[in-house]
Amino acid sequence: MNINVASLLNGNYILLLFVVLALGLCLGKVRLGSVQLGNSIGVLVVSLLLGQQHFAINTEALNLGFMLFIFCVGVEAGPNFFSIFFRDGKNYLMLALVMVGSAMVIAIGLGKLFHWDIGLTAGMLAGSMTSTPVLVGAGDTLRNTITNGPALLAAQDHLSLGYALTYLIGLVSLIFGARYLPKLQHQDLSTSAQQIARERGLDTDSQRKVYLPVIRAYRVGPELVAWADGKNLRELGIYRQTGCYIERIRRNGILANPDGDAVLQVGDEISLVGYPDAHARLDPSFRNGKEVFDRDLLDMRIVTEEIVVKNSNAVNKRLSQLKLTDHGCFLNRVIRSQIEMPIDDSIVLNKGDVLQVSGDARRVKSVAEKIGFISIHSQVTDLLAFCAFFIIGLLIGQITIQFSNFSFGIGNAAGLLMAGIMLGFLRANHPTFGYIPQGALNMVKEFGLMVFMAGVGLSAGAGIGNSLGAVGGQMLIAGLIVSLVPVVICFLFGAYVLRMNRALLFGAIMGARTCAPAMEIISDTARSNIPALGYAGTYAIANVLLTLAGSLIVVLWPGILG
């Protein structure tokens, strides 16, 4: 049996798409030194090579891919997006604006210098910034602004080419910049991290030890009753003195949860919960009694829940003001915009932050009701909300704004981004609305991006040979400039205008570039995870600004040429 692979792939778009994805994902695992190519560049390279052999897929698959990706970007940014504008995130907002704005201006200048079209210029900007949102925003706006078929195809091909030629340049140069730029400035990054740690009272060690509570049980003897001197539990203030609290009491065979009016009696059996050092602070009259090993008395249902910050008595409050340990609860993690933050008592909580809390199930539930709500542990996506807001995004994208003789269509990219932000924001405020498991969101976003990459690569591959020889050298120079110069500008602005702490500043710069590998290098250099505070501050807003930059550069281009 003879199988013509070329005919089989050309006759089956779905098969071709998944062959490209599979081969590209395999290529993406290849490492050049310490740098991994990554899924995006792997799929793009494979699709460009197959595109040269005149393989192609339906353009609707490309459109659906970019729509899913950009909508999911908005959903992820939504919970913390508005806090950037309305609170002390103004420094992070300004840094993100400087980074994206300077990169766009430099890209436009280089595009004019080298006499490129808008496709090459926007693609070079997207690749140099290692930013798929720029590519998506530019591609969508090109489809809305260029009505001539051949001109649109040429611009789209050049967009893919510019991205493919400069992506690896942008990634490698930023990683080297993250490694060596901190060493060129006069302040040591580790010292800056320690300074913030001293000011805010947090541990600079990224591997923070979390001690879980210990439960022990004792039989009340005459010595302990004498120590209590007839006072009830409220008057004794055991928790205030030691950090332990009485969780249960067994009296005459009956197990109960005591209230503050309970008075200890000889023969009672009590269970106390607290950190190990808290048990050590107990009065000797507790420990001198006979320790009890009773399954029911020692049985405490410890749970770990993710609590979403929502209520006004927690939003804009410092972490220390929650006094979680006073409620018998213990904090394990603080997550903002899918980024784990250092546990810092001075962190001001934003709406949508997630606190991972451990403790007795009843106590954790009580704390959650005061702070916000427990994130539901479901693997079921609210598809109705997902589809409804997706439709809203497409409808917003149809809006056209008219200024005199100039008209500007919002476009699907910006419309879906706005709808995604709205869905993410509402999800952070309503526990049962619009739930999308993080794993499902990641999968849809990644799949949409890979489909989009496969589409643009296959469409651009046919003409890549001729274009590569004409602009390859120029792209190398332009990619380095657009990748590194905005980083230097952002550093100077943050260091000497905003006067930011260097550890926070470098974290914020990497967040503005949305580059996780570079962020890891900054944390290693600082020997601390404190830069994550800055990274989280700029990451969400930068994703949105980069998408808008991709659309804006296409809109501005005709006027610049004129």
From Swiss-Prot:
Which compartments is it annotated to reside in? Cell membrane
Tagged with keyword Transport = yes
* Gene3D superfamilies in alphabetical order: Regulator of K+ conductance, C-terminal domain (3.30.70.1450)
Any Gene Ontology biological process = potassium ion transport
The UniProt transmembrane annotation reads 8-28, 37-57, 66-86, 94-114, 158-178, 383-403, 406-426, 447-467, 475-495, 541-561
Annotated protein name in UniProt: Putative transport protein Spro_1639
Q: Which InterPro entries match?
A: AAE_transporter, RCK_C, RCK_C_sf, Transp_YbjL_put, YidE_YbjL
Q: Which PANTHER family match?
A: K(+)_H(+) ANTIPORTER SUBUNIT KHTT, TRANSPORT PROTEIN YBJL-RELATED
Q: Which UniProt keywords apply?
A: Cell membrane, Membrane, Repeat, Transmembrane, Transmembrane helix, Transport
Q: Which residues form the RCK C-terminal domain?
A: 202-288, 290-373
Q: Name one GO cellular component term.
A: plasma membrane
The GO terms this record gives for MF are: monoatomic cation transmembrane transporter activity
Which family does the record claim for this protein? Answer: Belongs to the AAE transporter (TC 2.A.81) family. YbjL subfamily.
Q: How does it sit in the membrane?
A: Multi-pass membrane protein
SUPFAM superfamilies the record matches: TrkA C-terminal domain-like
